[in-house]
Amino acid sequence: MALRAKAEVCMAAPWLSLQRARALGTRATRVPRTVLPFEAMPRRPGNRWLRLLQIWREQGYEHLHLEVHQTFQELGPIFRYDLGGAGMVCVMLPEDVEKLQQVDSLNPRRMSLEPWVAYRQHRGHKCGVFLLNGPEWRFNRLRLNPDVLSPKAVQRFLPMVDAVARDFSQALRKKVVQNARESVTLDIQPSIFHYTIEASNLALFGERLGLVGHSPSSASLSFLHALEVMFKSTVQLMFMPRSLSRWTSPKVWKEHFEAWDCIFQYGDNCIQKIYQELALSRPQQYTSIVAELLLNAELSPDAIKANSMELTAGSVDTTVFPLLMTLFELARNPNVQQALRQESLAAAASISEHPQKATTELPLLRAALKETLRLYPVGLFLERVVSSDLVLQNYHIPAGTLVRVFLYSLGRNPALFPRPERYNPQRWLDIRGSGRNFYHVPFGFGMRQCLGRRLAEAEMLLLLHHVLKHLQVETLTQEDIKMVYSFILRPSTFPLLTFRAIN
């Protein structure tokens, strides 16, 4: 179709010439003094309803990141974008992220994910902080932060993640050494998928599922399948109002609800086990995030379940694909890989004794994860429904407007990141300083930043640390991997990677 053909051409072309990039990156400093009205803002051309119809026909919007990227090149760093009956403002410069944070209210608002909310309303379940807005969101968030996001919380659950990362590395090394050539070539994505669920489940509920290096139970496999169906059906339903999609896609809605039923049943079972253990005796040591929340009793059990389900669902693909793309980029950039290996080996003894030191003793590896998320932001955009009037790029933005920050375009702007197509973790160690706080915002900003951010960072950091100490990663694929938008930004195909033992 025309949409797909246009996207292919856009992807094949260079991001934009350096001259045009400089103009785009600095245009914000060359604006008239008089603030322009909202109606004067450039608007993305095209019929809003035909665009929505095309999304429905294609069951998604795979090339959203490329189309928006192209529109920034054509219209500048801000424009209006209409889709069906909804409208939004699109921006892509760090200074606009900063301004959005400056006008955040006590309860920063973003759009809800209708398929997820519809399920919870239909089944009578509470929503967690990912779906909530208003005072209830703030009430939940302030009581979750100490046990999920705070530095103290990270220090407590990080050794649990480290244990799973070690098991993953050992299982992969075992496969390698059992091969006569001391190497193995495979699609590593399913194994990483199992790892993230295992690590998240242990940190959240204090229970191993046997997904890493063991044979998983039938209940674990059913849970995995439900997660996959839930994500797939979310993409098929998220662009169309439920009042319409309930007639056009009843089968998908049925699959979506059944998948969530399985996920919530799994969560119920985990929480009931923790309840029973706490009823017998108070634990003498840290056991899990959910156990701490139940012991604190500042949130109702239903609210704890709702938030733990969101953390479980949100911790899977959002961690899997950055890990996969980091391994792929390291395979394509052996010099970078070797530098990271040397750093991990130098810190190995210290981290082995105190896993918490991984957060401070692996600066280049942390920079590599930043570089991956710059090129491949798993969350394509950040959003706010602004609570008060503000000015972005010299245009008046009225209260109640939906503003989206497109991270794909922010990260590939040559005015911000010289040679943006190059995978160069060192750039993050070189650009630290004032004025750069909003260059790296893949987990959001302000009070609404991702609640599971520290857990995701720990899972990625520790897996890479343990794998790189012992294994060389290689690939025959030197071409860029095509990315598609499917609720999150993900690779359209998974590269084959070769893991080779290091003598």
Swiss-Prot record:
Residue positions binding heme: 450
Pfam families, sorted: p450 (PF00067)
Origin species: Papio hamadryas ursinus
Protein name, as recorded: Cytochrome P450 11B1, mitochondrial
GO term, biological process aspect, one: aldosterone biosynthetic process
GO CC terms in record: mitochondrial inner membrane
Gene3D superfamilies according to UniProt: Cytochrome P450
Record carries keyword Heme: yes
Subcellular compartments: Mitochondrion inner membrane
Homology family: Belongs to the cytochrome P450 family.
Catalytic activity: a steroid + 2 reduced [adrenodoxin] + O2 + 2 H(+) = an 11beta-hydroxysteroid + 2 oxidized [adrenodoxin] + H2O; 11-deoxycortisol + 2 reduced [adrenodoxin] + O2 + 2 H(+) = cortisol + 2 oxidized [adrenodoxin] + H2O; 21-hydroxyprogesterone + 2 reduced [adrenodoxin] + O2 + 2 H(+) = corticosterone + 2 oxidized [adrenodoxin] + H2O; 21-hydroxyprogesterone + 2 reduced [adrenodoxin] + O2 + 2 H(+) = 18-hydroxy-11-deoxycorticosterone + 2 oxidized [adrenodoxin] + H2O
Keyword Mitochondrion: yes
This protein's pathway: Steroid biosynthesis; glucocorticoid biosynthesis; Steroid hormone biosynthesis
Keywords (A to Z) from UniProt: Heme, Iron, Membrane, Metal-binding, Mitochondrion, Mitochondrion inner membrane, Monooxygenase, Oxidoreductase, Steroidogenesis, Transit peptide
Chief localization: mitochondrion
Cofactor requirements of the protein: heme
Transit peptide endpoints, chain numbering: 1-24
